[in-house]
């Protein structure tokens, strides 16, 4: 989607209501550098989709640190009417569930790739998906390939089906069953799951050029220009378009012709030509249905291209014969889709599959089929025509499982179910059902088949990473090993110490923090609560922590919402979420979560800084962590619930990730209660970490944190949260549910929600930078209330994925570079240091400058790091 932008001023941009589904415009806060980064992913498209949701007020907003998220952009803000609007987990914060490395993913061209190969080599490749609503397989481009660390105590689930298909992934990864999606952990032996029976072929890489401009010497220059504009020349072996061209050429040799005036026409059934047209459109070629059984290509240039690729000959072109197996497979599937016979059975025995054409071409086809272990004979018919015949059962099975048909939906679906049946025959002894019985009992539209699960195991992963793929298609699934698969915050603690006092002991201090505050992937807290004991934490948040000795009573005055959202309901949180959260309470986690010892090195507003208790040269500590696995599980649980409910409420669904329900619905209110519980867990978590930070300072400096070191909390802000607030819209006060995803509340002076000790100057806003760069403290403003529902940015925002960062940076080198700059880093692994390299993030100075110039937050102070502890 190309999203138009209208410049308002130097740092404000508007996404106009260019799509009739948009209820409001989009508003983007960014300079030109930051905006260009947003254009490189789906940030602006996601903001456009948010603008389509019911009950939205004013704008769909993107902060300068905005980047692509799940459903909503990270750095996105949207306010919905509490009566007419919606609530969406994707607008508050959500991650992904994943599959094991080595999992094979099926592409549109019929070859498999390992899921971990996708990010580097095949990000432009389209994948096969199951279009649930229309009941057939389809193709989709990839939105993202994501990865995450496997937790130290995390288990994976491995399931095996009766035909030997295996899938292994995180416990929360969904697979498709006849009744809908089910988490891997909930699959039981004897259950049925949906599989895509096609086996396909391995990928073979071939380098070089198939066709370049020299092939068109003497032709009209417009032909070359047309083809170059559509990236159809030069045509290289590695180009994903080659597979499409191979199957179109196969179809054209049987059911296409080029007229004397260079018009290209395909003929066939309407549903077949519809599929051909989709492939043509993917190449940028327009085609129109001239009659019920004819599809005409409007460009003579494409006809010239097919001629050069071999359509004018009565034999298979050399480039197909010389090509890798997957290219041959696409050519043959297009050819048999056009003119091959549909597979039929007599009881449990398959009848021969035939193809009628010239003897020369059939001889070529027979030779190519041998590479797929398919034996064929060529026979002469009564009328002098020639027929290729595949008649032995092994060859029929290999043809259906490795080649099959393209373009003809009926042939393809029946061929897939037939292949599954022939595999089923091998496994069954006696009492064998006929093919037609099997198709009725196990077959689904599109050629999908229900297979019984014969083994389910919980296993300890022998690998470090899980992977997942996001696709653009609304089906939001992909074929993996033949199976269809489918609140955070920041706290700032001040001290009375100066850099001069801390610098000599910075290594000892950071090492002590690292020792006392559990961190790392799957890290567990120092206290041991059973999952049945955390309901009080979910209700009382930071108050529970203080009541249990983790902090001081006055801490609660300095936390957003007092560290406790009213209305949290532990009953709305699943047992699984509690089981994930309980052992992690009081731990930092990994990735971009951190403890950072900082020095206030610049004061922009002395009056406000004084109110916040800050001075130049002062040492402060910043804590960034959230609700850990509990918060993720809450979002995951309710996404599934809402996906089932959304059709009931007839809510627009512009993006599969952007699931939502009416805020006042039963599902909406229950999710809001669960989200509050997750937020309370996060506040309790940061409160416990604060207690251990104070203990660490006491251990190193031998001084009392309260009486000597003055280690008060400056403030604690949430940046993945939904809140019911009152705001002014078009001169009227309205109640809204504000979604802040990777965005921070920024209330102005005088607002009743701002703590009394800061009410004269405005709410503190904490903006962490990336590792090794500055962080900022700002103050909320009236400008934020007027423009952004009292919201501003939350940090620097990534520009490189974690995988890309590890390819570009080495953790040990980054750590040494930071040490050379006077920043000591202690991390659970050097990989995390590489993932969090400063270059993996946007320039936080630019981000803060934009919000300051926009007047949606006011600069107060800048802090630079001198010590970092990371999980």
Curated annotation (Swiss-Prot):
Q: Which cofactor does it need?
A: Mn(2+)
Q: Which residues form the signal peptide?
A: none
Question: Which residues take part in binding GMP?
Answer: 592-596, 719-720, 768-771, 775, 794-797, 870
Ranges for domain DOD-type homing endonuclease come to 248-374
Q: What is the effect of changing residue 95 to A?
A: Abolishes tRNA ligation activity
The EC designation for this entry is 6.5.1.8, 3.1.-.-
Q: Note how its activity is modulated.
A: Activated by archease, which accelerates both the RNA 3'-P guanylylation and ligation steps. Archease also expands the NTP specificity of RtcB, enabling the efficient use of dGTP, ATP or ITP.
Give me the comment on cofactor binding: Binds 2 manganese ions per subunit.
Q: Which reaction does it catalyse?
A: a 3'-end 3'-phospho-ribonucleotide-RNA + a 5'-end dephospho-ribonucleoside-RNA + GTP = a ribonucleotidyl-ribonucleotide-RNA + GMP + diphosphate; a 3'-end 2',3'-cyclophospho-ribonucleotide-RNA + a 5'-end dephospho-ribonucleoside-RNA + GTP + H2O = a ribonucleotidyl-ribonucleotide-RNA + GMP + diphosphate + H(+)
Q: What is the effect of changing residue 594 to A?
A: Abolishes tRNA ligation activity in vitro. Can be rescued in presence of archease (PH1536)
* Assembly: Monomer.
Q: Give any extra note attached to this record.
A: Ligation proceeds through 3 nucleotidyl transfer steps, with 2',3'-cyclic phosphate termini being hydrolyzed to 3'-P termini in a step that precedes 3'-P activation with GMP. In the first nucleotidyl transfer step, RtcB reacts with GTP to form a covalent RtcB-histidine-GMP intermediate with release of PPi; in the second step, the GMP moiety is transferred to the RNA 3'-P; in the third step, the 5'-OH from the opposite RNA strand attacks the activated 3'-P to form a 3',5'-phosphodiester bond and release GMP.
Q: What is this protein called?
A: tRNA-splicing ligase RtcB
Q: Point out the gene that encodes the protein.
A: rtcB
């Amino acid at each position: 989607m190309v999203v138009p932008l209208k410049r308002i001023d130097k740092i404000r941009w508007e996404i106009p209501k260019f799509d009739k589904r948009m209820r409001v415009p989009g508003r983007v806060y960014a300079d030109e550098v930051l905006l260009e980064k947003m254009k490189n992913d789906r940030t602006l498209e996601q903001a456009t989709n948010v603008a389509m949701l019911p009950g939205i007020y004013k704008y769909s907003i993107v902060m300068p640190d905005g980047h692509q998220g799940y459903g909503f952009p990270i750095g996105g803000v949207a306010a919905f009417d509490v009566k007419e609007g919606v609530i969406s987990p994707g607008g508050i914060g959500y991650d992904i569930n994943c599959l094991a490395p080595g999992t094979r993913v099926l592409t549109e061209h019929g070859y498999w790739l390992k899921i971990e190969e996708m990010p580097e080599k095949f990000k432009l490749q389209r994948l096969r998906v199951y279009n649930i609503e229309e009941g057939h397989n389809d193709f989709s481009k990839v939105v993202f390939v994501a990865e995450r660390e496997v937790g130290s105590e995390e288990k994976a689930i491995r399931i095996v089906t009766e035909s030997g298909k295996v899938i292994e992934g995180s416990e929360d990864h969904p697979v498709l069953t006849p009744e809908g999606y089910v988490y891997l952990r909930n699959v039981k032996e004897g259950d049925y799951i949906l599989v895509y029976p096609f086996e396909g072929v391995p990928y073979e890489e071939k380098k070089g050029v198939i066709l370049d401009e020299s092939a068109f010497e003497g032709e009209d220059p417009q032909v070359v220009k047309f083809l170059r504009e559509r990236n159809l020349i030069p045509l290289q072996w590695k180009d994903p378009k080659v597979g499409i061209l191979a199957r179109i050429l196969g179809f054209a040799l049987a059911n296409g012709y080029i007229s004397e005036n260079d018009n290209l026409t395909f003929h066939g059934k309407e549903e077949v030509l519809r599929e051909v047209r989709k492939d043509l459109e993917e190449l940028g070629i327009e085609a129109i249905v001239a009659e019920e059984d004819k599809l005409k290509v409007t460009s003579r240039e494409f006809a010239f291209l097919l001629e050069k690729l071999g359509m004018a000959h009565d034999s298979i072109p050399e480039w197909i014969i010389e090509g890798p197996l997957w290219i041959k497979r696409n050519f043959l599937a297009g050819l048999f889709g056009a003119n091959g016979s549909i597979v039929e059975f007599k009881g449990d025995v398959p009848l021969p599959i035939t193809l009628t054409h010239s003897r020369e071409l059939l001889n070529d086809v027979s030779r190519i089929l041998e590479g797929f272990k398919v034996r064929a004979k060529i026979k002469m018919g009564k009328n002098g025509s020639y027929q290729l015949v595949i008649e032995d059962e092994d060859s029929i099975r290999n043809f259906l499982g490795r080649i099959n048909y393209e373009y003809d939906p009926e042939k393809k679906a029946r061929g897939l179910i037939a292949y599954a049946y022939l595999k089923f025959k091998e496994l069954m002894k006696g009492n064998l059902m006929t093919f037609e019985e099997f198709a009725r009992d196990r077959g689904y539209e599109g050629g999908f088949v229900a297979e019984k699960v014969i083994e389910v195991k919980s296993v300890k992963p022998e690998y470090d990473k899980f992977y997942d793929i996001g696709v653009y298609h609304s089906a939001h699934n992909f074929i993996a090993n033949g199976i269809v698969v489918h609140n955070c915050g920041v706290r700032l603690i001040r001290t009375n110490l100066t850099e001069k006092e801390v610098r000599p002991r910075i290594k000892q201090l950071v090492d002590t923090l690292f020792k006392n505050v559990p961190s790392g992937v799957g890290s567990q807290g120092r206290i041991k609560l059973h999952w049945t004991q955390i309901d009080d934490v979910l209700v009382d948040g930071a108050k529970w922590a203080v009541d249990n000795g983790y902090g001081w009573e006055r801490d609660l005055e300095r936390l957003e919402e007092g560290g406790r959202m009213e209305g949290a309901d532990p009953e709305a949180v699943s047992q699984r979420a509690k089981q994930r959260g309980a052992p992690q309470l009081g731990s930092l986690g990994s990735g971009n979560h951190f403890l950072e010892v900082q020095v206030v090195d610049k004061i922009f507003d002395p009056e406000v800084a004084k109110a916040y208790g800050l001075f130049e040269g002062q040492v402060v500590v910043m804590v960034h962590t959230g609700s850990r696995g509990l918060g993720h599980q809450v979002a995951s649980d309710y996404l599934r619930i809402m996906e089932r409910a959304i059709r009931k409420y007839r809510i627009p669904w512009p993006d599969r990730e952007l699931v939502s329900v009416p805020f006042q619905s039963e599902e909406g209110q229950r999710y809001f209660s669960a989200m509050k519980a997750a937020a309370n867990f996060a506040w309790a978590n940061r409160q416990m970490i604060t207690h251990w930070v104070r203990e660490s300072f006491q251990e190193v400096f031998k001084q009392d944190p309260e009486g000597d070191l003055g280690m008060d909390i400056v403030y604690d802000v949430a940046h993945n949260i939904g809140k019911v607030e009152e705001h002014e819209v078009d001169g009227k006060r309205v109640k809204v549910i504000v979604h802040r995803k990777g965005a921070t509340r920024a209330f102005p002076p005088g607002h009743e929600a701002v703590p009394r000790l800061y009410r004269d100057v405005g709410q503190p806003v904490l903006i962490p930078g990336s590792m090794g760069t500055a962080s900022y403290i700002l103050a909320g403003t009236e400008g934020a209330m007027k423009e952004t529902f009292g919201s501003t940015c939350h940090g620097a925002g990534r520009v490189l994925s974690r995988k890309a960062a590890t390819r570009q940076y080495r953790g040990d080198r980054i750590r040494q570079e930071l040490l050379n700059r006077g920043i000591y880093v202690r991390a659970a692994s050097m990989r995390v240091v590489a993932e969090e390299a400063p270059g993996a993030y946007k320039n936080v100075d630019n981000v803060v400058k934009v919000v300051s110039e926009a007047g949606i937050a006011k600069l107060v102070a800048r802090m630079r790091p001198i010590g970092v502890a990371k999980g």
